[in-house]
Amino acid sequence: MSKHKNQRTARTLEKTWDTLNHLIVISSCLYRLNLKSIAQIALSVLAMIISTSLIIAAIIFIISANHKVTLTTVTVQTIKNHTEKNITTYLTQVPPERVSSSKQPTTTSPIHTNSATTSPNTKSETHHTTAQTKGRTTTSTQTNKPSTKPRLKNPPKKPKDDYHFEVFNFVPCSICGNNQLCKSICKTIPSNKPKKKPTIKPTNKPTTKTTNKRDPKTPAKTTKKETTTNPTKKPTLTTTERDTSTSQSTVLDTTTLEHTIQQQSLHSTTPENTPNSTQTPTASEPSTSNSTQNTQSHA
């Protein structure tokens, strides 16, 4: 049936193309004869035919595709039915003893049913089978225990991400261009490297600073010594004043006279009986006589 439909569709498409070719030839002839109105009508009809033919062809292809899909689903269902029928026929033909023997290694329930009817030899076999099953279960539990160990190894996989991040840090700034993110990454690399160098530099810097501080201190000490020596020079002025004019010497004599007068007044107030009082005027009298002689010489 599908072959006949495909042949029909092919024939209809051929007929439509033939009619389209004839209409194109007719429209060209009408243009040559200057019958534009008739040519326009023919072209409109041609467009309608083309659109209808395309729609018909699309519908036909869709139907054929759906028919193919239904055929595939039918074939799959038929295959399943055949397999199920074959299995059922095989089970009906095979005796139940073979079926039970085939099921014994998988399940333990048929073992107990047979143990009631069989001899003690068969019971021992059943014990062996149960022991084997128990051994399998124990081995399975033992195999499950080491499975927990690799789980502990999974967490150390995190540093791999850090390693990739470190590799990403080594980005040359020449590649960045105008990308601000790339520039920010490039700035972090040099900022981290020089941090290690200043740890060595501060050890050398203090040595230079101490030498610079000691140099300016030495002239300061010399200046202090000079200030101490200045007061010693002041008494020299007194020596120079003695060699000056006579007017200055008279002033000094008057000062000495005043001192002597004060001493005499003090001696006059002291009692005469004390031995100290008798001795003091003897010491003071020559001083007064000397002072008077000096005044006369100057006069």
From Swiss-Prot:
Membrane-spanning parts: 38-66
GO cellular component: extracellular region; host cell plasma membrane; membrane; virion membrane
Keywords: Disulfide bond, Glycoprotein, Host cell membrane, Host membrane, Host-virus interaction, Membrane, Secreted, Transmembrane, Transmembrane helix, Viral attachment to host cell, Viral immunoevasion, Virion, Virus entry into host cell
Disulfide bridge map: 173-186, 176-182
Site note Cleavage, residues: 65-66
Pfam families according to UniProt: Glycoprotein_G (PF00802)
Residue numbers spanned by region Disordered: 89-160, 189-299
Residue stretches of biased makeup (Basic residues): 148-157
Region Binding to host heparan sulfate, annotated ranges: 187-198
Stretches in topological domain Extracellular: 67-299
Family the entry assigns: Belongs to the pneumoviruses glycoprotein G family.
Protein name as catalogued: Major surface glycoprotein G
Name of the gene this protein is made from: G
